Structures are given as C-alpha cells and as structure tokens.
Amino acid sequence: MTRNKYFILLSCLMVLSPSQGQEAEEDLPSARITCPEGSNAYSSYCYYFMEDHLSWAEADLFCQNMNSGYLVSVLSQAEGNFLASLIKESGTTAANVWIGLHDPKNNRRWHWSSGSLFLYKSWDTGYPNNSNRGYCVSVTSNSGYKKWRDNSCDAQLSFVCKFKA
C-alpha cells in the first residue's frame, strides 16, 4: 500500500511540475529593445538613416554625437540585408549611402569606425578599386544597397548610424 502512495504522489508531482514552470515563464516580461523615435532596432542595436548629405568624416562625427554611435558597421549578411531594407523603406533616391568602413592610412587596410573587426565583406564587382582614390565606403543602390563601393571621403552622401539600444 505504501508503494502505491509514493507512485501516486510522484505522478502528481510530474504532472504539476511542467505547468508550474510554464506559468512562471509566462509571467516574465519580454526583453524588448527600445530605440529613439525615427530609428529601427536590429539585434541589440538601433539604426538611424539620415537623408542629409555629409562627407564621410562629418557623417561619422554626427553619429558619434547621436547616442554615442558610429556610421553603421555591417558584420554579417543578415545585418547587410537589414540595412538594405532600412534604406529602401526610407524611400530615398540616393545612389550611395555611407557605411562605417574606411581606410584611414590609405593603404587598402579597411577598418570599421566603431572598432569592430573587419571579417565580413560585401564588395561590389570590381571594388575596391584604385581609380577614384576612394578610402571610404558606401552601399550602392545598383545592388539594392547590399554591395559596397569605395568612394572619395569628401563625397556628400546620406548615411546610416548604428548605436547601442
């Protein structure tokens, strides 16, 4: 008889345990990223498209002054796809949009202004090239804003800022 009591007690505990944990899980608030108005969240960052046209250095400084960010670093294909969608959804007609990749020593060693490692690449066919002495990088509308081209850092382009949420 005692054996049956333990079996019944154990059975009840097994039935109640999963539902107890489930209720507690449902009570927890979900972690949501909040970004300032006009910016969009992706992963743990906020992204802000700026239609104004600035040089690469002016654009990066603008981003640093805005929520301690930088020109956008594109660290994966998924992030590149998000960036392309963000720019297209803005309705811009810009042919090129600055990103945070540059060659500060003009030696074809590319760096993200944020200090992120340069591991992912998405160069457009034939780029980077040496013909235009471009040491700053933009995404191009010809590729749906998914491919990169080097440009003169003095070119006046729209840009995207990236900052921690």
From Swiss-Prot:
Cross-referenced Pfam families, in alphabetical order? Answer: Lectin_C
This entry's Gene Ontology molecular function terms read:
growth factor activity; identical protein binding; molecular function inhibitor activity; oligosaccharide binding; peptidoglycan binding; phosphatase binding; protein phosphatase binding; signaling receptor activity
Question: Glycosylated where?
Answer: N129
Modified positions (Pyrrolidone carboxylic acid) in chain numbering: Q22
Q: Which GO terms describe its biological process?
A: antimicrobial humoral immune response mediated by antimicrobial peptide; cellular response to chemokine; cellular response to gastrin; gene expression; liver regeneration; midgut development; negative regulation of cell population proliferation; pancreas regeneration
Which keywords does the record carry? Disulfide bond, Glycoprotein, Lectin, Pyrrolidone carboxylic acid, Secreted, Signal
Where in or outside the cell?
Answer: Secreted
Signal peptide interval: 1-21
**GO CC annotations on file:** basal part of cell; dendrite membrane; extracellular space; growth cone; neuronal cell body membrane; perinuclear region of cytoplasm; protein-containing complex; zymogen granule
Lineage top rank: taxon:
Eukaryota
Coiled-coil zones: none
Gene3D superfamilies linked:
Mannose-Binding Protein A, subunit A
Q: Where is the C-type lectin domain?
A: 33-163
Disulphide bridges: C35-C46, C63-C161, C136-C153
Please describe the organ and tissue distribution of this protein's expression: Expressed only in regenerating islets, but not in normal pancreatic islets, insulinomas or regenerating liver.
Role, per record: Might act as an inhibitor of spontaneous calcium carbonate precipitation.
Q: What's the protein called, per UniProt?
A: Lithostathine
Name the encoding gene, please.
Reg1
